[in-house]
Amino acid sequence: MKRRSFLTSAAAFGAAPLFANNTPVHMPKGKAEHCIFIWLGGGMAQIDTFDPKKLGNNTDKTKVAGSLYKAIDTTVPGVQVTEHLSQTAKVMEHVTVMRTVNHHVIDEHAFATNIVHTGRMISGNVVYPSIGSIIAHERGAVGGEVPPYILIGYPNVSRGPGFLGAKAGYVYLTDTNTGPAGFSRPDFVDEKRALTREQLLAPLMARAPKESAIADYKTAQEQALSLSGPQFMRHFNLKEELAALRNAYGGEFGQRCLLSRRLVQAGVRFIEVSHNLNFMNGTGWDIHNEGYKNQHLLIQELDTALAALIRDLKDKKLLDKTLIVVGTEFGRPPEFDGRGGRGHQGTTFSMVLAGGGLNHCGAYGVSDELSKKPVENPVPLVDFHATVHAAMGIDPSKELMDGTRPVPITDGGKPVAALFG
């Protein structure tokens, strides 16, 4: 994105999101205790997944805009998804696809990823916290033996705590077989030796001013020490699960989703699960050019894992307590590029909510005939953030402190009232 275009977009976003509603509303308070945020890095094509339209054609010389896959019915009358979401179609009574999410001005992966995670444009003055860090800050962990926020994916500033500091940060892992790195003591450091090291370090840390980066580091270190050892690491042992259940979740991405359920049971408040761990332009859900040829495999992986997660949480009576979010940085237009792929689109795209004690309806909002813009119930991104916070029992209008400066959790976001009883 050119600098002039970005500045123009930033000004537009700051002025008003698409179809924003400025009337005061009552802030509902949901009952969800946990949030699993599934991240589809690269830009999921809503028209090929959760918002199917008429069939298009991307192989002929004269291409026809539309969906690549056939639409199928779901358990919610009148709500359809594409054929590669056949398992999710069977549990849609627990799901609401927000089909009219928009941020309108974003057309670049890094900026869009940041805005979907923080609800705000990048600022030169403020590092805004991510949605995971805000929930971790406001709700904390359910139990003292786990952190409030775990990221299954590579660390990134867009997922970070921003001005909230290290205490609202995440513990991350990239391998479901080993769990987070650095939380098990080396064999040569027994409990006595570890205690001696802590005692030697304590006087140095005590001298640090309370309001300093060192104090933040101290807080993070204390948490790390409290998590070290087998008590915390046992939550990452997927071998404790029945083989049939592990198989139901599918491959590595599915195992990450299974791990997220175990972390919910352990008391972790917010878990982000990355589908493709190390997203690079042109990979994963970034389906430019020939990228579309593997898109059906990505959708099938998502379908298998998402449906299994919903069923598993329901079986364990955790679904009403656990809000599942499926997010992506933007959607895709109905038109095809020269080699059959799709470009970027922020004017309308789909995000998914499941469980969490919400009043689900299969789909909310209606896009136009080719899913290019909203025609009913538009959901500006700031309202989507407000809906997630409200579902987690957090007031999205509450002010957090950046030093002495109050910053509201959302910029005037209003929860979608239809989802709350």
Where are these regions (language model features)?
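Ligand-binding pockets and gating/stacking loops
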Residues: 1-421
